[in-house]
Amino acid sequence: MVMRDTFDELLVNKAQEFGAELLQNSEVKSIENGILKFANSDEEIEAKFIIIADGALSPVSKLAGFKDDRLLIPAIEYEIEVPEEDFERLSKSVRFDIDAAPFGYGWCFPKNNHLSVGVGVLKTKAKVKLKDYCESYMKDLGINTIISESAHGFVIPVTPRAELVKGNCFVIGDAAGFADPIVAEGISNALLSGKTIAEALAEGNLER
């Protein structure tokens, strides 16, 4: 499986090949009447359509006035380097384990030379002890030695927004709450929703 930063870079490069312009270090501070203003410059961009795809926290959707009624579940993931025998044993398949955490699940994804191991839970149903749950899950997987590790926490939107369009603004992907409600995977539906809105705008068919 590919690392997310590598995949994102590929998407950016492909978009640029088709004429997209990448603005870096450009934080949107306001959206009014289709005009985007930025926190670190006086530049303004007027857009006929604004597609908001800024992830689960989606600060831009708040600026656009979208109500956030998604259910967000907390999760933690470790990128771990393990001994060769453990990597060989656990890199043969993708794992989802529904008994890894109370009211949640765990996952173990093989990457090029390490494992991505994490857990996510319904915070309304269980006292959140993500680190403890993940460490226990790794032991259940038979991982007793970790050579190196890095951890990051995040939230996963497992229910969609009631409102996906507001004026000329559209939310897609995790910003819209399109993660799979069973396994909480978001990339597939993010790509599908992006493709759908792009085709609809290209066709001039906003009822799709």
Model regions: which residues?
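Structural motif
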Residues: 35, 114-116, 168
